[in-house]
Amino acid sequence: MSNMPVNPPSWRNDTVLPLPNEVKANAWAVDAACSGNPGPMEYQCIDLQTGAQVFHYGPIHGTNNIGEFLAIVHALALMAQKGITDKVIYSDSVNAQLWVNKKQCKTKLERTPQTEQLYQIIARAENWLRTHPV
């Protein structure tokens, strides 16, 4: 059993998680999940230094890409609100990163009574991006 990974690896003393060397532990990681697409969607943020959940939202009817987008904006807004300037945000969603850079959620999700609340959250996120430096 000596080949089993140690959590955390002995060479990482800045995290409780098994992170590769190139990943900064002083960071938050965001991710979304969706059961079906569209379907029940939720997202969360984890502090890589402590492993603690920073926030969680959902489930709400949506898509995975929307959840990834909202998770990034939620993390950015929370960092701004708390005056956190020394952390990195990690996201594995290229689409969400592009949408954040363009300050617009480019979803094709149909706007219906079931998705209206989500569209209001998206509008709030887009407005936050337009009114804050990212």
Please describe what each predicted stretch is.
Residues 29, 33-37, 77-134:
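RNase H catalytic domain
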Residues 5-66, 70, 77-81:
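RNase H-like nuclease fold core
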